[in-house]
Amino acid sequence: MKKDYIIESEKTWDSIAKSFDKTRRKPWQECLDFIKEISEESVVVDVACGNGRHLIPCAKKCKNVIGLDISRKMLVIVKEKTIKENISNVFLIHSTAEDIPLKDSTIDAVLFIAALHNIYGKENRIKSLKEIKRILKNDSKAIISVWSRYTNKFRKSFQNKNLHSKKIEFGDKHIYWRKDGLDIPRFYHLYGKKEFIEDLEEAGFRKIKVKGVKIKSEKYNDNYFAVVTK
Protein backbone atom coordinates (compact mmCIF):
# COMPACT_ATOMS: atom_id res chain seq x y z
CA MET A 1 0.00 0.00 0.00
CA LYS A 2 1.37 3.39 -0.99
CA LYS A 3 2.18 5.84 1.78
CA ASP A 4 0.07 8.99 1.89
CA TYR A 5 2.98 11.31 1.09
CA ILE A 6 3.80 9.31 -2.05
CA ILE A 7 0.19 9.45 -3.26
CA GLU A 8 0.10 13.20 -2.60
CA SER A 9 3.41 13.74 -4.39
CA GLU A 10 2.25 11.79 -7.42
CA LYS A 11 -0.93 13.88 -7.64
CA THR A 12 1.04 17.10 -7.28
CA TRP A 13 3.50 16.39 -10.08
CA ASP A 14 0.82 14.98 -12.37
CA SER A 15 -1.15 18.21 -11.85
CA ILE A 16 1.70 20.50 -12.88
CA ALA A 17 3.42 18.30 -15.49
CA LYS A 18 2.39 20.26 -18.59
CA SER A 19 3.03 23.64 -16.99
CA PHE A 20 6.36 22.43 -15.59
CA ASP A 21 7.48 21.30 -19.03
CA LYS A 22 7.00 24.81 -20.42
CA THR A 23 9.42 26.33 -17.94
CA ARG A 24 12.03 23.58 -17.51
CA ARG A 25 13.53 23.10 -20.95
CA LYS A 26 17.17 24.10 -20.52
CA PRO A 27 19.47 21.48 -18.95
CA TRP A 28 21.85 22.46 -16.17
CA GLN A 29 25.41 22.99 -17.39
CA GLU A 30 26.62 20.98 -14.40
CA CYS A 31 24.65 18.01 -15.73
CA LEU A 32 25.92 18.45 -19.28
CA ASP A 33 29.48 18.51 -17.93
CA PHE A 34 28.77 15.30 -15.99
CA ILE A 35 27.30 13.63 -19.09
CA LYS A 36 30.40 14.56 -21.10
CA GLU A 37 32.49 12.42 -18.76
CA ILE A 38 30.27 9.34 -19.16
CA SER A 39 31.36 6.61 -21.56
CA GLU A 40 29.27 6.12 -24.70
CA GLU A 41 28.81 2.46 -23.71
CA SER A 42 27.26 3.38 -20.37
CA VAL A 43 23.85 2.52 -19.02
CA VAL A 44 22.59 5.57 -17.15
CA VAL A 45 19.61 6.13 -14.86
CA ASP A 46 17.89 9.50 -14.50
CA VAL A 47 16.05 9.24 -11.18
CA ALA A 48 13.06 11.61 -11.02
CA CYS A 49 13.64 12.46 -14.67
CA GLY A 50 10.77 14.93 -14.85
CA ASN A 51 10.22 16.20 -18.39
CA GLY A 52 13.48 14.70 -19.62
CA ARG A 53 15.57 17.83 -19.97
CA HIS A 54 18.67 15.92 -18.83
CA LEU A 55 17.59 12.48 -19.99
CA ILE A 56 17.41 13.51 -23.67
CA PRO A 57 21.01 14.83 -23.99
CA CYS A 58 22.20 11.80 -22.03
CA ALA A 59 20.37 9.42 -24.39
CA LYS A 60 21.97 11.09 -27.40
CA LYS A 61 25.38 10.07 -26.09
CA CYS A 62 25.02 6.90 -24.04
CA LYS A 63 24.13 3.31 -24.90
CA ASN A 64 20.93 3.14 -22.83
CA VAL A 65 19.13 5.50 -20.47
CA ILE A 66 16.48 4.56 -17.93
CA GLY A 67 14.16 7.31 -16.76
CA LEU A 68 12.26 6.94 -13.48
CA ASP A 69 9.60 9.28 -12.19
CA ILE A 70 6.76 9.30 -9.68
CA SER A 71 4.55 11.15 -12.20
CA ARG A 72 3.03 9.16 -15.05
CA LYS A 73 2.22 12.41 -16.85
CA MET A 74 5.87 13.45 -16.75
CA LEU A 75 6.79 10.10 -18.28
CA VAL A 76 4.25 10.65 -21.07
CA ILE A 77 5.95 13.97 -21.85
CA VAL A 78 9.35 12.26 -21.99
CA LYS A 79 7.98 9.51 -24.23
CA GLU A 80 6.58 12.08 -26.66
CA LYS A 81 9.96 13.83 -26.81
CA THR A 82 11.85 10.61 -27.53
CA ILE A 83 9.46 9.79 -30.36
CA LYS A 84 9.77 13.29 -31.79
CA GLU A 85 13.58 13.09 -31.72
CA ASN A 86 13.66 9.47 -32.93
CA ILE A 87 15.41 8.27 -29.78
CA SER A 88 15.03 4.53 -29.20
CA ASN A 89 17.44 3.81 -26.33
CA VAL A 90 15.28 5.20 -23.51
CA PHE A 91 13.32 3.01 -21.11
CA LEU A 92 10.79 4.61 -18.76
CA ILE A 93 9.64 3.31 -15.39
CA HIS A 94 6.94 4.65 -13.08
CA SER A 95 8.69 4.50 -9.72
CA THR A 96 9.68 6.39 -6.60
CA ALA A 97 13.30 7.10 -5.79
CA GLU A 98 12.94 5.23 -2.52
CA ASP A 99 12.25 1.89 -4.20
CA ILE A 100 14.08 1.63 -7.53
CA PRO A 101 13.18 -1.59 -9.41
CA LEU A 102 16.68 -2.30 -10.73
CA LYS A 103 19.31 -4.87 -9.77
CA ASP A 104 22.31 -4.16 -7.57
CA SER A 105 25.53 -2.81 -9.11
CA THR A 106 24.27 -2.70 -12.71
CA ILE A 107 24.32 1.02 -13.55
CA ASP A 108 27.26 3.08 -14.82
CA ALA A 109 26.02 6.54 -13.79
CA VAL A 110 23.02 8.19 -12.14
CA LEU A 111 21.46 11.64 -12.38
CA PHE A 112 19.22 12.73 -9.48
CA ILE A 113 18.50 16.38 -10.15
CA ALA A 114 16.30 18.71 -8.08
CA ALA A 115 14.25 15.89 -6.60
CA LEU A 116 15.81 14.69 -3.35
CA HIS A 117 14.43 17.82 -1.70
CA ASN A 118 10.88 16.84 -2.72
CA ILE A 119 10.95 13.64 -0.65
CA TYR A 120 9.18 13.90 2.69
CA GLY A 121 11.12 12.75 5.74
CA LYS A 122 14.84 12.37 6.35
CA GLU A 123 14.54 8.58 6.54
CA ASN A 124 12.99 8.48 3.08
CA ARG A 125 15.59 10.83 1.61
CA ILE A 126 18.41 8.68 2.97
CA LYS A 127 16.66 5.59 1.61
CA SER A 128 16.55 7.11 -1.88
CA LEU A 129 20.26 7.95 -1.72
CA LYS A 130 21.04 4.41 -0.60
CA GLU A 131 19.00 3.08 -3.52
CA ILE A 132 21.12 5.10 -5.94
CA LYS A 133 24.26 3.75 -4.32
CA ARG A 134 22.86 0.21 -4.50
CA ILE A 135 22.21 0.23 -8.25
CA LEU A 136 25.55 1.86 -9.14
CA LYS A 137 28.53 -0.27 -10.09
CA ASN A 138 31.55 0.04 -7.83
CA ASP A 139 33.57 3.22 -8.49
CA SER A 140 30.72 4.65 -10.59
CA LYS A 141 29.41 8.17 -10.04
CA ALA A 142 26.17 10.04 -9.54
CA ILE A 143 25.29 13.72 -9.75
CA ILE A 144 22.74 14.89 -7.21
CA SER A 145 21.32 18.38 -6.71
CA VAL A 146 19.11 20.10 -4.15
CA TRP A 147 17.73 23.56 -3.46
CA SER A 148 19.40 25.59 -0.73
CA ARG A 149 17.44 26.97 2.22
CA TYR A 150 19.74 29.98 2.54
CA THR A 151 18.83 31.83 -0.64
CA ASN A 152 17.67 35.43 -0.83
CA LYS A 153 14.13 34.06 -1.20
CA PHE A 154 14.05 31.54 1.65
CA ARG A 155 16.75 32.41 4.18
CA LYS A 156 14.48 34.59 6.37
CA SER A 157 12.28 31.55 7.01
CA PHE A 158 15.23 29.64 8.46
CA GLN A 159 17.37 32.26 10.20
CA ASN A 160 16.44 31.14 13.71
CA LYS A 161 16.23 27.38 14.14
CA ASN A 162 14.77 27.79 17.65
CA LEU A 163 11.72 29.60 16.24
CA HIS A 164 11.04 26.89 13.67
CA SER A 165 8.06 24.63 14.36
CA LYS A 166 9.10 21.45 16.17
CA LYS A 167 6.31 19.58 14.37
CA ILE A 168 8.23 19.57 11.07
CA GLU A 169 11.86 19.12 10.09
CA PHE A 170 14.01 22.23 9.93
CA GLY A 171 14.15 22.99 6.21
CA ASP A 172 10.65 21.75 5.36
CA LYS A 173 8.53 24.18 3.38
CA HIS A 174 5.62 24.13 0.94
CA ILE A 175 6.37 26.13 -2.20
CA TYR A 176 3.48 26.87 -4.52
CA TRP A 177 3.43 26.32 -8.27
CA ARG A 178 1.65 29.43 -9.53
CA LYS A 179 1.80 29.31 -13.29
CA ASP A 180 -0.87 28.77 -15.97
CA GLY A 181 -3.62 29.49 -13.46
CA LEU A 182 -2.45 26.77 -11.07
CA ASP A 183 -1.98 27.22 -7.33
CA ILE A 184 -0.55 23.92 -6.13
CA PRO A 185 1.66 23.38 -3.06
CA ARG A 186 4.80 21.27 -3.49
CA PHE A 187 6.69 19.81 -0.56
CA TYR A 188 10.36 20.78 -0.25
CA HIS A 189 13.05 20.02 2.26
CA LEU A 190 15.47 22.86 1.61
CA TYR A 191 19.06 21.96 2.40
CA GLY A 192 22.06 23.57 4.02
CA LYS A 193 25.41 22.49 2.58
CA LYS A 194 26.49 20.73 5.78
CA GLU A 195 23.27 18.72 5.99
CA PHE A 196 23.51 17.77 2.31
CA ILE A 197 27.02 16.40 2.78
CA GLU A 198 25.99 14.57 5.96
CA ASP A 199 23.10 12.84 4.17
CA LEU A 200 25.36 11.79 1.31
CA GLU A 201 27.87 10.40 3.80
CA GLU A 202 25.16 8.56 5.73
CA ALA A 203 24.06 6.91 2.48
CA GLY A 204 27.60 5.57 2.09
CA PHE A 205 28.96 7.65 -0.77
CA ARG A 206 32.62 8.63 -0.95
CA LYS A 207 34.65 11.24 -2.83
CA ILE A 208 31.87 13.74 -2.29
CA LYS A 209 32.41 16.99 -4.20
CA VAL A 210 29.80 19.69 -3.60
CA LYS A 211 29.44 22.87 -5.63
CA GLY A 212 27.16 25.81 -4.86
CA VAL A 213 25.38 27.50 -7.76
CA LYS A 214 23.80 30.95 -7.81
CA ILE A 215 20.80 31.75 -10.02
CA LYS A 216 18.92 34.74 -8.63
CA SER A 217 20.73 35.25 -5.33
CA GLU A 218 23.69 37.63 -5.53
CA LYS A 219 25.38 36.48 -2.34
CA TYR A 220 23.99 33.05 -1.47
CA ASN A 221 23.86 29.75 -3.33
CA ASP A 222 20.48 28.78 -4.74
CA ASN A 223 21.41 25.16 -5.43
CA TYR A 224 23.98 22.57 -4.42
CA PHE A 225 25.33 20.00 -6.86
CA ALA A 226 27.21 16.96 -5.59
CA VAL A 227 29.21 14.47 -7.62
CA VAL A 228 29.64 11.31 -5.57
CA THR A 229 31.28 7.92 -6.01
CA LYS A 230 30.11 4.51 -4.84
Describe the residue ranges of each PLM region:
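Conserved class I S-adenosyl-L-methionine
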Residues: M1-S42, P57
